[in-house]
Regions:
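Conserved SAM-binding loop
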Residues: 12, 87, 105-108, 166-167
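N-terminal helical cap/lid subdomain that shapes the substrate entry/recognition surface
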Residues: 2-93, 97-101
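Ser/Thr-glycine-rich phosphate-binding loops at phosphate-binding pockets of nucleotides
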Residues: 11, 15, 109, 173
Length: 222
């Protein structure tokens, strides 16, 4: 194993309840649209523009959809800033283990720059991660489920994506990871483990980061 790449939302923090509320608030305020739980999970893990196009039945696309996504993310940042939430159990200890063993690791998230900057501030991520090596939605590449974001993250780390482990919690994220060539582990994130095992090509499923270690991950490549 040469490196590890983490998705963020739903993988390093369980923020589904916060993000769901943010999307429902925004959809109602902006479009007078009542977003259902089923729709939330349908779009979860995809770029915000995909949500907007779906909510508006394709009436809003392109730059206008990007503007709407940015407005929604302002709502999310406000909601997250006010929430009492921490990194998933075992994450900090796992980061420390990776640092101690000089294993490169980074984040690949569909979130935009403002969001990842908030994540770094709220969760003190600077002690483990280099922001310049994180991949996030800057509008220059296709979002998940396309493989681009994980290929970019691996390149920033200077590692071979085919020798990386990716941690993901959504169907589109898992597809992005394995399409790039990585081994993908599914994060349960409070859901039924059987639902995560249904995601194509996951090599393992975990509840939190107390269930993984370097030795176990290295076995995936033998």
């Amino acid at each position: 194993m040469e490196g590890i790449i983490f998705d963020f939302n739903g993988t390093l923090i369980f923020d589904d309840p916060i993000n769901m509320i943010s999307w429902k608030k925004y959809a109602k305020r902006k479009f007078n649209y009542d977003l259902t739980d089923e729709e939330y999970y349908k779009y979860n893990g995809t770029p915000g523009e995909t949500w907007i196009e779906g909510i508006t039945k394709g009436k809003i696309t392109g730059k206008e959809a990007t503007k709407c996504r940015e407005e929604k993310e302002e709502q999310y940042r406000e909601d997250l800033s006010n929430a009492e939430i921490d990194l998933i159990k075992g994450a900090k200890e796992f980061f420390n283990e990776l640092k101690k063993n000089n294993i490169p690791f980074t984040i690949a998230t569909s979130a935009d720059k403002e969001n990842i900057e908030l994540f770094f501030k709220k969760f003190n991520l600077n002690q483990w991660f280099d922001l310049s090596k994180c991949a996030y939605n800057d509008g220059t590449f296709k979002g998940k489920p396309n493989p681009d974001i994980y290929l970019i993250a691996a390149k920033k780390l200077g590692v071979d994506i085919k020798k990386c482990v990716v941690f993901e919690d959504t169907k589109s994220g898992v597809k992005s990871g394995y399409s790039a060539g990585a081994k993908v582990i599914g994060m349960i994130a409070g859901r039924n483990p059987e639902d995560i095992w249904k995601f194509e090509k996951v090599v393992d499923v975990i509840n939190d980061f107390t269930e993984v270690n370097i030795e176990k991950l290295n076995q995936l490549f033998k």
